[in-house]
Amino acid sequence: MILALAMSTDAFAAAVGKGTALRNPRLSEALRTGIIFGVIEGLTPLVGWALGSIAADSVADWDHWIAFTLLLILGLLMIRAGLRAEEPEATPAIRHSFWLLAATGFATSIDAMAVGVSLAFIDNNILITAAAIGLATFLMVTLGVMVGRLIGNVAGKWAEILGGLALMGVGTVILYEHLTM
């Protein structure tokens, strides 16, 4: 369970950023985001486990760069949208597309794929582990979107800028952690 919670922390931070960008997201939007992130986060260790040692060395060389680049681009897009935003009353409610959520979910789950690779070498039930990671991520992301909503209501039109900075921060932390290992 500790592994599952650890794997979901990046997704939680990204979800807070997403929640700040959504004007008054409903619980259904938070659940939708949680499901997308949870499914992706639960599947990536399975993919990593299946790849096993075949691609471990090559994936480890660039996984952090992919995550950093995706989160940087998504963060910059959110900041740009925030800078262009009009007053909250004049802007339509935002609903993040499936593909935008999936890209963010994938970027925050690359580390789970690497964990899956390492799990291929130990005696572990990968299905239970992957399900626990997916469930923990679902719960953390759903909570993160709602926390982001509170921050967004306080921050007003700056919420999307803050959300973009949060995504860029998550990407930077991922890059830093891998470069200093």
From Swiss-Prot:
Cellular-component GO terms for this entry: plasma membrane
InterPro entries: Mntp/YtaF, Put_MntP
Protein name per UniProt: Putative manganese efflux pump MntP
Annotated compartments: Cell inner membrane
Membrane-spanning residues: 35-55, 59-79, 102-122, 126-146, 161-181
Topology of this chain in the membrane: Multi-pass membrane protein
Source domain of life: Bacteria
MF terms in GO: manganese ion transmembrane transporter activity
Family of the protein in this entry: Belongs to the MntP (TC 9.B.29) family.
Family matches, as HAMAP family: MntP_pump
PANTHER family: MANGANESE EFFLUX PUMP MNTP-RELATED
Principal location: membrane
Protein's organism: Nitrosomonas eutropha (strain DSM 101675 / C91 / Nm57)
Pfam families per the UniProt record, alphabetical: Mntp
Role noted for this protein: Probably functions as a manganese efflux pump.
Keyword line: Cell inner membrane, Cell membrane, Ion transport, Manganese, Membrane, Transmembrane, Transmembrane helix, Transport
